[in-house]
């Protein structure tokens, strides 16, 4: 079963929604801001239900979230040496935003990356799933 809950407003002014998924004694909470995992609750060895995801209780915690807790990172995740990637022989330069001398790129764009955007959500009640999509213009990030 999937239910939705309003969660606030993104800095862009778009409403943010939490999707609550329940199946076989487990519960997952995800939101469309950053296609972010908010929580996964499962029974522990004592059969107590515990949340195994680090994150914040309020939406605004995700606005300034340098650890990117739960968010979808991309198009490039982790560190990229000198902020450069090579695709089909063409070198693309990304902003250098990481390291003591800011010589590398971390997670494409920490300020405007995929984890900072409101994604489109599609709920499928038959398969009990939520799918998130985010379209970018060619070369946007």
Whereabouts are the PLM-identified features?
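Surface-exposed acidic/polar loop and edge beta-strand patches at domain peripheries
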Residues: 1-141
């Amino acid at each position: 079963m999937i239910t939705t809950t309003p969660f606030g407003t993104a800095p862009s002014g778009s409403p943010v929604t939490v999707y609550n998924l329940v199946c076989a004694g487990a519960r997952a909470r995800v939101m469309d801001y950053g296609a972010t995992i908010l929580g996964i609750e499962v029974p522990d060895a004592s059969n107590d239900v515990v949340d195994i995801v680090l994150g914040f209780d309020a939406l605004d915690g995700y606005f300034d979230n340098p650890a990117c807790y739960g968010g979808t990172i991309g198009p490039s995740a982790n560190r990229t040496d000198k902020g450069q990637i090579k695709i089909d022989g063409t070198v693309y330069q990304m902003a250098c935003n990481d390291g003591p001398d800011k010589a590398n790129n971390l997670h494409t764009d920490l300020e405007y990356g995929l984890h900072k955007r409101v994604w489109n959500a599609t709920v499928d009640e038959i398969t009990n799933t939520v799918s998130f999509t985010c379209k970018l213009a060619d070369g946007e990030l």
